[in-house]
Structure formats: C-alpha cells, structure tokens
Amino acid sequence: MSGTVMQIVRVAILADSRLTEMALPAELPLREILPAVQRLVVPSAQNGDGGQADSGAAVQLSLAPVGGQPFSLDASLDTVGVVDGDLLVLQPVPAGPAAPGIVEDIADAAMIFSTSRLKPWGIAHIQRGALAAVIAVALLATGLTVTYRVATGVLAGLLAVAGIAVASALAGLLITIRSPRSGIALSIAALVPIGAALALAVPGKFGPAQVLLGAAGVAAWSLIALMIPSAERERVVAFFTAAAVVGASVALAAGAQLLWQLPLLSIGCGLIVAALLVTIQAAQLSALWARFPLPVIPAPGDPTPSAPPLRLLEDLPRRVRVSDAHQSGFIAAAVLLSVLGSVAIAVRPEALSVVGWYLVAATAAAATLRARVWDSAACKAWLLAQPYLVAGVLLVFYTATGRYVAAFGAVLVLAVLMLAWVVVALNPGIASPESYSLPLRRLLGLVAAGLDVSLIPVMAYLVGLFAWVLNR
C-alpha cells in the first residue's frame, strides 16, 4: 500500500512579490503541475484580470531556485533535487532553444522527448475533430436527403437539402470571423449541399437544366468565398478560383445543351476551347483578380507620374501571393475542363473516329508540353497530370459500362505514361531545359505550337462546322 502514496514536497514559491507555501507532487513533470501553481500564486488570473492571463498565455513560466535558471518543464521536483523547505521563484522561461531535458534513463529520454510527447493531445485536436465531425455529418446528411429526394420525389427531401445548404453557408460565413481556418473548411464543404440543393430544385428528370443551376450555384458561392476577407484567404484562393471557373464553364455548357440540344461531342469540344482560353489568359486574369496596380507609362513630354502610395507598396507581397494562388487555380480549372471535354468526346469509343482520338491525344500532349512554360510547381503538376486524369476517368467509365477492350487500351496508356515518368526520374537531365541544345528547344517549341494550332481546326471539323459552311 505504501507504493501507491504520492511523494510530495513542501516549498515556498515567490511570484509577483507574493510568497505562497504549498505542497507539490515530487514525481510529476513541472509541465503538469505549473497550471495549478499559477492559479494559486497569481490570484488575479481568477479575478478576471485579462492582462495577467494574456501574459501567462504568451510567456511560458517555470519554477527556479533563487538566482538560478528555470527548471526544465519535463523534469520533476525530485529529479532537480528540490527538498522540503526550499524557496522557489516562478519566472519566465528564457527565449531561445530549450535546455536539454533532465532524465534518469535513456529509454525514458527517448519516450519523453519523442515527437508525440512534445506535441501532445490538446484542445486544438478536439477542435479539429469537432470540425471534421460537423463536415462529415453535413456531407452524409446531404447524401441521405439527396437519395431520399431522388428515390421518392418527396418535397421534404428537397427542403432538408436546402436547409443543410443554408446552414453550411451561414456557418462558413459567421465562423470565418472568429476562426478563419474552420470557416474556410466549412465554406468548402458547403459547395456540396449548395450544388445538390439547386440541382434538385429543378423539377423533372436529371438533365442539363439541373446541371446548369447546380453549377451556377457552385460558381456563385465560390465567388462569394473569394470576396470574404480573412486571415486564411490566401490558402484557399486557388481552390475557389478553380471551382468558380469550372462551375461557370459547366453552367455555360449546360445552358448551350439546353437551348440547342447539342451532341455530347460538341459539348466536349466547347469545354476544351474554354480550357485553352483559360490557360492562355491565366497570367493576365490572375494579375487582374489580385488587383495589381496598372503601370503608368507617360508619353514623351508628359510629367513623371507620382510614386505609388507606401501602403500599396507594402501590400504588394501579399498581392503577389494572391496572384500566384489565382494562377494555380486557373491552371487547375483549365486542366479539369480539358479532362471533362476529353471524356465527353471519348465516352463512346465505338463511335469515335480517328480524328476524335487525335483530338484527345493532342490535348493531352499539348498540356504536357505546356508545362515547360510555367515555373510554379502547382501549375506544372496540374498540366502533367492531365493525361493521367483523362486515362483514369476513361478506364473507370469503360470498366463500369462493360467496354473492356477500351478499358484495356486505357490501362496501356497509363502504363506508357508510368514508364515515361520512371525514365525521367532515373534520368533527371531529360526534365532539365538547360540540358537541351538550342535547335532541340526550337524543335520542341515548334511541336508544341503545332499541336496547339491543330486543335481548333480539328474541333471545327468534329462539330461539323466545315460541313455546315460548305453546304450553305
């Protein structure tokens, strides 16, 4: 029974010109007993004095002998040699790297100073878990209500989805003021119920009208999220930019299908054209959306323009980061649009001509060659991923619809792409532009330009534009 008794030590603690005697556990780390010590020796923190509480949160405190250095927070009073009757001082831990911890065994040291012990479970983990639970429940409830609405056609399903969408949107807007990161996560999750609610709001069988309203809602909410100021806005500018561009493009494609009953091949060509336009204008649009100051070039004889305001110059680094994020979002949207267009063109492989297959392959090759132009790692990654995304989506679709020969062809394409990546990884010089001679660079640029130029005539031929002009 004596082994279960906790050893204590009676000490006097001096803090803020106040001497307090107390009995403390001798075998617990100081990190665990200091919060209680601070509450006892600094009573102002309990009386609502915000200054003491804030300073305690900003400056880490520890016990120390009079005139000595603070003890390590991972050491116990017994380890540092504190005995009954000692006088200790509660003082801040000096800034800089922490002193080596005091341990009695190397195995204890390996465990005490491991990453999991230095970053233990805390309130931040509980908050993240609560946020993840809220998002998961919202998404699962959205899936349930959408399924219920589609299966039964009852109005209650639509009202439930609309309620989830409104609650998610309001939560994202309101929580962003207090916790920007949590609010942004909720804003991203709100895209699903918003799109689902607007799509289900259109009566009738699922078709272009539902896609039009759902995509328009996703684009509108993405633009709203981009306009909301927050401390974490720069982290999600790329995501909402891509969502807005893809949503607007898909909405336009669905509107064209709704008005003119276009074939799926024409819709795919239109999406590829939109992807090309977004890619070409990505740099200009990103600078415009980041609100870069327009250059003022005076004409000969005009007075020299005044210097930009200091506040504008100080804000330029932030605008550069925002512009880079917008650019990554535009490139990601262009890649996703080209993937959607290629899949729409090749969705029926048995009815697709050689020209159609050339368009799919040329679009992928042009995106890969276009990656050499961009310095951003995110832009390069998206452009190089375009062939994989197209082949992967087609593989899943062909397998699901029983087109196993076409699915086997998609697997072969993925295998060839994988071998290409392995070869480049083993020979890094292939991916280094400096290793290419000037004639080879010109040849590569000529091939890329030829692929880009050939896309528009091929798409015009596929949609029947040439035949329409000749048969007028």
From Swiss-Prot:
Protein name per its UniProtKB record: ESX-3 secretion system protein EccD3
Membrane topology reported for the UniProt record: Multi-pass membrane protein
Biological source species: Mycobacterium tuberculosis (strain ATCC 25618 / H37Rv)
Subunit architecture: Part of the ESX-3 / type VII secretion system (T7SS), which is composed of cytosolic and membrane components. The ESX-3 membrane complex is composed of EccB3, EccC3, EccD3 and EccE3.
Any single Gene Ontology cellular-component annotation: plasma membrane
Similarity-based family: Belongs to the EccD/Snm4 family.
Induction comment from the UniProt entry of this chain: Repressed by IdeR in the presence of iron and by Zur in the presence of zinc.
One Pfam family per UniProt: YukD
Top-level division of the source organism's lineage: Bacteria
Described function: Part of the ESX-3 specialized secretion system, which is important for iron and zinc uptake or homeostasis.
Localisation per UniProt entry: Cell inner membrane
Record keywords, A-Z: Cell inner membrane, Cell membrane, Membrane, Transmembrane, Transmembrane helix, Transport
Transmembrane segments: 121-141, 155-175, 183-203, 211-231, 236-256, 258-278, 327-347, 349-369, 381-401, 405-425, 450-470
Keyword presence, Transport: yes
Extra information: Was identified as a high-confidence drug target.
Keyword Cell wall biogenesis/degradation: no
